[in-house]
Amino acid sequence: MEFIYQFVWIVPFFPFIASILIGVNLLFFPKSTKSLREIWAIFSILLLSIAMIFSFNILWQQINDNIIYRYLWSWIFDNKIDFKIGFLIDPLTSIMLVLITTVGVLVMIYSDSYMSYDQGYVRFFAYLSLFTASMLGLVLSPNLIQIYIFWELVGMCSYLLIGFWFTRPSAANACQKAFVTNRIGDFGLLLGILGFYWITGSFEFEILFKRFNDLVINHEVNLYFANFCALLLFLGPIAKSAQFPLHIWLPDAMEGPTPISALIHAATMVAAGIFLVARWFPLFQLLPFVMTIISWVGAITAFLGATIALAQTDLKKGLAYSTMSQLGYMMLALGIGSYQAGLFHLITHAYSKALLFLGSGSVIHSVESIVGYSPNKCQNMAFMGGLRKYMPITGITFLLGTFSLCGIPPFACFWSKDEIITDSWLYSSTLGSISLVTAGLTAFYMFRIYFLTFEGDLRVNLNKVAFTYPVSIWGELNLNKKNSNKNKFVLNKYDIFFETDQNENQTDNLSFFSDIKKLKYPKESDNKMLFPLLVLTLPTLFIGFLGAPFPEGQIGSDLLSQWLYPVFKSAEEITSGNWLEFGLNAINSLSVVFSGIFIAFILYGPFSLFPQNLEKNIEFSLEKNLNSFFSFIYNWSYFRGYIDVYYNIVFVKGTRLLAQSLSFFDEWIIDGFVNGFGILTFFEGESIKYLEGGRISFYLFGLIFGMIILLFIGFFGAMF
């Protein structure tokens, strides 16, 4: 057992070696490396697969032994400081290792086909391996400094992968936005780390938690300062896990390749923030004020993400806001003390969301052959519809992922989400109401995405490249009405417009894709892309039973609580009780969920007649109110809750205005004064030089005249 633990460094080391070898060969031998790109891809998949096998072995040892293992060695030490590096293995670490490696391997297999036509194929696998290695190093870290190092590596990799197609202006802007937004959180994280080192004198988790616990119990620490430092620590997860108000980078991250979207939203970047809050849970639980802030940030994020996702037209951005909402659920659970439910939802959501994103990638990959390679076309659900007939495996797996994310039993997310909703009600009726309403919204927008994408008729061939035609919110093309709306902030009733890319021609006519013929109808993806989808359906169906409330245990009614007990044994968790109580509480949430599905079916379903008969079935005043209501919802969703608009006006334009004002002040006031003084001196010298004639008598006259003037001034000055 100990032998296995001593070699756990292999888990992050293997994908790290893969990224280094690919990067070095790509730098010094680019032609030969690109010619052997399939071999390098297999090499990356093989090394990460070995890491996955080790991860499963470690998880099995943790299930059997249920102990915490640390391996440390001194890196920097003197009389005053002894900084150690190493790794920490506990149930939380083992679960995260399996989660990261399994999703990572499936994403790599998927990427082999998805990125096959891309010139950056080899570079993509180098970034992918480094991204996975960074996240694995993060979850194995035993101290704050080591976590911060890998935390920054994760951020760097996300920057590289979001901006992978850096020649596309939108991708370049998106990676910069993600980088700058996360810098805010990382700065707070660094200050929080330094603050707790000042309080406890240690970076090691075990020592830090014990010392801080003793300081709080003995009232030997300033709680105001401790709360402030804890909030600074929490600022890091707020940014990394896209929590309000630093969530704005997440939808823009969809500019990266779809496999990376699956990895970011399932097992790496956004999961890092949740993992950190879980790792620091023994610290945060001693500070009730911070726990309250965490819970409310999570609740606001969950509800906000769900409302913004309601009318998204971009397939990937709709799923991105879904991720934001589900991360809010996890943060809410951790904030109310239900750590098991939060981590449980992290696991179930990861596999379900990976399935959904890879399914969306399969759709995009197929639709690209019809509409071209512009994201505003191939990701726009207004061009889709009826894809289940052409892509049955993708459609079925996407539907299973939708069932899970909506919380329909017996799929995975049902068990975790319902537990969070129930625990929220036990903690606060307000938080419980928010989580319950969010569940209904989730069911609505997820089935809206499914119906617009896979049901009905294929709409792209009806459009005839008339991108100015709107499509109603119900998902039907309207070829009789032109877009006459010119207001930047108000969209016309409930219309979804085809947005064209200003670089559309360059995107669609890339010479690299010139040999690919456009098809009239989409077709199912190849086996390399379908295999990960089929594999991910298994955890989507069955992993929820890991935390199902079966026989009562000592500290919880499920296996997951028992595995996590050594990590959180000091926590007083809110629990929803036994199987019967859980089932009774699930009735309310399921009723809300099925209501959301029913509304989505009426508005977007394949047999929907409500929109066509709207004017016949309801009174004019009600129709007008409904139009205003739907218009508000769509405007709110389209403009992302106006938060991006606010940030753009206050921070972006405000900063530019300040910079322009400072530039004007520097150029015309500071430089003007200095340059003006120099010019004045120059003209003064030029004027005086003509008084010099070379005659001594003239100089004596000037000297005597000057003395007389000075005496005159001195005499009259003394009198007055």
From Swiss-Prot:
Subcellular location as annotated: Plastid, Chloroplast thylakoid membrane
Keyword set, alphabetical order: Chloroplast, Membrane, NAD, NADP, Plastid, Plastoquinone, Quinone, Thylakoid, Translocase, Transmembrane, Transmembrane helix, Transport
Transmembrane segments: 9-29, 39-59, 87-107, 125-145, 147-167, 189-209, 221-239, 258-278, 286-306, 327-347, 354-374, 395-415, 434-454, 530-550, 590-610, 700-720
Biological-process GO terms, alphabetical: ATP synthesis coupled electron transport; electron transport coupled proton transport
GO MF annotation list: NADH dehydrogenase (ubiquinone) activity; quinone binding
CC per GO annotation: chloroplast thylakoid membrane
InterPro entries recorded: NADH_UbQ_OxRdtase_chlpt_su5_C, NADHpl_OxRdtase_5_subgr, ND/Mrp_TM, NU5C-like, Proton_antipo_N
Major localization listed first in the record, in broad terms: plastid
Membrane topology: Multi-pass membrane protein
Pfam family, one: Proton_antipo_M
Subunit structure: NDH is composed of at least 16 different subunits, 5 of which are encoded in the nucleus.
Family: Belongs to the complex I subunit 5 family.
Function: NDH shuttles electrons from NAD(P)H:plastoquinone, via FMN and iron-sulfur (Fe-S) centers, to quinones in the photosynthetic chain and possibly in a chloroplast respiratory chain. The immediate electron acceptor for the enzyme in this species is believed to be plastoquinone. Couples the redox reaction to proton translocation, and thus conserves the redox energy in a proton gradient.
Stated name of the protein: NAD(P)H-quinone oxidoreductase subunit 5, chloroplastic
Species name: Physcomitrium patens (Spreading-leaved earth moss)
Gene name of the record: ndhF
